[in-house]
Each structure stands twice: as C-alpha cells, then as structure tokens.
Regions:
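Residues that flank catalytic or metal-binding motifs in active/ligand-binding sites
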Residues: 148
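Catalytic core of tubulin tyrosine ligase-like
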Residues: 152
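Domain-core detector
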Residues: 1-145, 158-207
Length: 207
C-alpha cells in the first residue's frame, strides 16, 4: 500500500510499479545511470503525493528507502539470473558465492540471514553433500541470497579445476572493525549503514 496525506488511488500504486520496472530496465541497458533513475523515480512519485510505503505487515518505509532498495535488488537479481543461466547451460552444478565488506550479519548465527557467514563459499544447485544448499543461503527468501538489498552474486565453479576467489583470511578481514567514527571503530557493515542513512537524507532533500 502507498501512504501519503490521503488514501491514494490504484493508479498511483500502479505508477510505482511502472517506474521501478522502467528504472530497472534503464539502468540494466546502460541508458541512464543508477543515480539518475533513482532521482527521477523519487521526484515523479513525490509529485503524485507519495511520501511513504506501508506493507501488509504494517511496516512503513520512506519513499527514498523503497526506491533505492527496489532498484538495487532488481539489478542484482538480473545479474544473478544471468550467472545461473550460464552455469545451467554448461551443466555446472556448483556455484561460488561472491563476498564483500559490509555484508549483513543478521542474527549473528550460522544461518541464511547472516550473509557474512555464507559469502565466499560454494553452493550446490542440486544439493550435493559437502556444499551449502540453496536453503542454507536463503535463496528465495527476502532475507537471504538475492533478497532485498543483497549485493551478492554467484559464478560457475568447477571443483578440482577452479581456484577459490577468497581465502578465509580475506573473509575475516571483511568483518574486522577498522573504520574510525566518533572515537570508535566500525565494521564495514556498520559504516555502510551510516552512509546509506546520509544518502537517503540527500535524496529526500532534493525531492
């Protein structure tokens, strides 16, 4: 549901979906930059009276948050789908997950909500023993791999031939607190969260 100063018509709800679809295609094709598409979408929706989105759960997000998350998620899912299609066309069953600093830690346990736990590891599309499964990484769950705001991807991996892209030392370094802020050290995840808050504020200011 869309929330503004009044109950908004279905036409405005459809506008949100249309703008996000068009924005995704514009960025994926290279016609416009990510920043250009986000700014345009936010301005058009704001002009229609939309300033926040309320989900069935009752949770409400600001317009800037919704647009940024939808664009980022859609673009990454397209890249992930291409990688999976390439693997299947080559009859490859094992995929190597990418890794990056600032991966979310979820509840801190060894489960799919903790992206820093499974990133950089190998996953079997068919569920072969000795590898992570699609369930282990939360494939298909909004909180897991390729879910909302997830920046991870995966690539075909040939056991016995391919060389792992990440060492355990590299993965550990991603999670080490090393960014100074107000007299304390932040992990990259914490620093990214603060940076995103600043970016959202800037997008809101230029509406």
């Amino acid at each position: 549901a869309l929330m503004g100063n009044h109950n908004l018509p279905v036409a405005v709800q459809e506008q949100l979906g249309r703008l996000l679809d068009q924005g995704h295609l514009s960025v994926a094709s290279g016609a416009f930059s990510y920043d250009q598409v986000v700014r345009r979408s936010i301005k058009e929706l704001a002009a229609s009276g939309v300033d926040a989105i309320t989900y069935p759960s009752g949770h409400t997000d600001k317009l800037e948050t919704v647009v940024l998350r939808a664009m980022r998620t859609g673009i990454n899912q397209t890249a992930m789908d291409i990688s999976q299609h390439n693997a299947e066309s080559m009859d490859v069953d094992v995929m190597e997950l990418t890794a990056h600093g600032g991966a979310r830690t979820g509840d801190g346990k060894a489960d799919f909500t903790n992206h820093s736990w499974w990133q950089g590891k190998l996953v079997s599309l068919s569920g072969q023993p000795g590898y992570l499964t699609l369930d282990d990484i939360g494939y298909g769950d909004v909180r897991g791999f390729a879910g909302a705001n997830c920046r991870h991807n995966w690539h075909p991996f040939w056991p016995g031939v391919s060389k792992p892209a990440y060492t355990q030392e590299t993965l550990d370094e991603y999670n080490r607190p090393k960014f100074p802020y107000n007299g304390q050290l932040l992990t990259e995840e914490q620093a990214d969260r603060r940076q995103r808050a600043c970016i959202l504020g800037l997008y809101g200011a230029v509406r």
